[in-house]
Each structure stands twice: as C-alpha cells, then as structure tokens.
Regions:
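Short glycine/threonine-rich catalytic loop with a Thr-x-Gly-x-Asp
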Residues: 34-51, 61
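Conserved phosphate-donor
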Residues: 1-38
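Short coil/turn connectors at secondary-structure junctions
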Residues: 7-9, 25, 43-46, 58-61
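N-terminal loops that bind phosphate or other acidic moieties
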Residues: 19-33, 58, 82-86, 113-114
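Buried hydrophobic packing segments
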Residues: 48-55, 65-68, 95, 99, ...
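Charged C-terminal helix
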Residues: 74-114
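Conserved post-catalytic alpha-helical subdomain immediately downstream of the catalytic base
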Residues: 52-90
Length: 114
C-alpha cells in the first residue's frame, strides 16, 4: 500500500483479511469484517461505492478510506451475526441493510483500527 501510494501520489486502499490504507505518510490497518464477505459477489463494489461516498465528504482521502472500510467491515460483522444460519443471499442483503443502519456510536464501539 505504501509503495502504491508513493508511486502514484495517491491514497491506496487494499481490502483483505486486514484492510490497509496508506497515503505514503500514514498507514492504517482495519481489523473489521467477516470471512463470509469474500463468498458474496458485490462486496468489493459496495466497498468502492462507500469509499467514493466518504471521499466526497472530505479533502483527506486517508480518513475517507479508513471510514469507508471500517464501516463496510462492521456491516459485514453485523450481517453475519444476523444471518449465520442462513445462506449467502440473505447475508448479502443483510450487509446492505446493515450499512444503511450504521451510526456513529456503532462505528466508535465496534471499529478495530490500528
């Protein structure tokens, strides 16, 4: 992430088991999310859309990336809690529901940012 951010003079946002955000000067790791998210088509697209939405609200793309991936990860965790005995279709819909219901307190309580 640091190399990409430095080479292209941008903020790099990389998703995975641990999400990484870097602007070449700062680095953050997000430990939210659930493995089930990798089994559903569209979670990457959702993450991109949410990142764009947060980017539109600030000049600090590093903070926008942190906010976006933390929100998406928490939504995935909540969705899994609600649908762990159901299929991936229910899980995908629950992610959408969870992201639309997130509030500041939930993000502050559940966010795992290093």
């Amino acid at each position: 992430a640091n190399l990409v951010a430095k080479k292209f003079n941008c903020t790099a946002v990389i998703t995975g088991k641990v999400d990484i955000i870097s602007d070449s000067k700062r680095l953050a790791k997000i430990f939210n999310g659930h493995p089930q998210m990798s089994k559903v088509t569209g979670t990457g697209c959702m993450s991109s859309a949410i990142t764009g939405a947060f980017a539109a609200t600030t000049n600090d793309m590093f903070l926008a990336g942190i906010a976006a991936l933390t929100s998406m990860g928490i939504a995935g965790e909540i969705a899994y809690e609600k649908t762990q005995n159901l299929g991936t279709g229910s899980f995908r819909n629950a992610i959408i529901d969870s992201i639309s219901c997130l509030d500041t307190n939930t993000i502050l309580e559940r966010g795992k940012i290093e």
